[in-house]
Amino acid sequence: MNDFPDPLSQLYCKFGRTVEMAQVMEFEAGNFALALISVMFDPEKINNEQRRMFKSVIDDVDKRTFGNLLNLIRKRVSISEEIEETVSQALEKRNYLIHRFFKKHNFAIHSEEGRHAMNIELDDIYRTINLAHAVLSAMTHTLNQAFGWPNISQEETLELIRKAKTG
């Protein structure tokens, strides 16, 4: 059941797709933060206290905003200026998308020209956020490879912790 005119549906679809990419990027920042912390553990010698601490860290990462995660990462590692700029631009555009995009365009959504401008802007925001996601993903993968950790998702990490508790 779609009561929106087709061009409006397309705009909302593009907005949703861009917001989804922002969430994927945030999730990858969390994966990188967890990868940074995981290098402190030897998976062959992890004890229950370390498991609880790691679970606590995962819970903390889940509650952080993207900006807070970036600050956590910046405290732990030195990041090149190019990467810093890429990720900072994505953070800025993510915040604009979530908090100000529709407010800025206000009545523009009601005209073809306005929707066109909004679509162009959403494409730009998507590209910026997608690039930051790719950079964060590559950083996570590289860190995991450097320390011999498998590249697994947060869900897989939680499952390993659950298995270790019951195993």
Name each region found by the language model.
Residues 1-8, 70-78, 112-113:
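Short, charged/polar, low-complexity loop and linker segments
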Residues 37-88, 92, 96, 100-107:
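Flexible secondary-structure boundary motifs
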Residues 110-130:
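Short secondary-structure subsegments characteristic of cysteine-rich extracellular domains
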Residues 10, 17, 82, 86-89, ...:
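Alpha-helical initiation/capping and key positions within long helical/coiled-coil segments
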Residues 1-64, 88, 138-160:
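Amphipathic alpha-helical interface elements
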Residues 7, 14, 79, 83-86, ...:
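Residue-level recognition of alpha-helical structural elements
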Residues 26-29, 91-94, 98-101, 126-129, ...:
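A structural signal for well-ordered alpha-helices, especially hydrophobic packing surfaces
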Residues 162-167:
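Short acidic DE-rich linear segments
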